[in-house]
Structures are given as structure tokens and as C-alpha cells.
Amino acid sequence: GVFCGELCIKASCSIPGCECIAGLCYKN
């Protein structure tokens, strides 16, 4: 639920532990 400060285009995030949700990277 915490925004990782990264946008995701290909449903992948470069920041470890972060997942792509609705175009944004979130972690918990």
C-alpha cells in the first residue's frame, strides 16, 4: 500500500518488493 515513487508501464517495477498496481508501483 505504500507508493514506491515509480511509475510502471510494462507491469513491472525496478524497485525490489514493489508491484505494479494501476500504473503505479506499490509496496504493501
Swiss-Prot record:
Keywords, ordered alphabetically: Disulfide bond, Knottin, Plant defense
PTM: This is a cyclic peptide.
Biological process terms in GO annotation: defense response
Disulfide bond residue pairs: 4-18, 8-20, 13-25
Summary of the function given for this chain in its UniProt record: Probably participates in a plant defense mechanism.
Protein family: Belongs to the cyclotide family. Bracelet subfamily.
UniProt domain comment: The presence of a 'disulfide through disulfide knot' structurally defines this protein as a knottin.
This protein's name: Cyclotide vodo I2
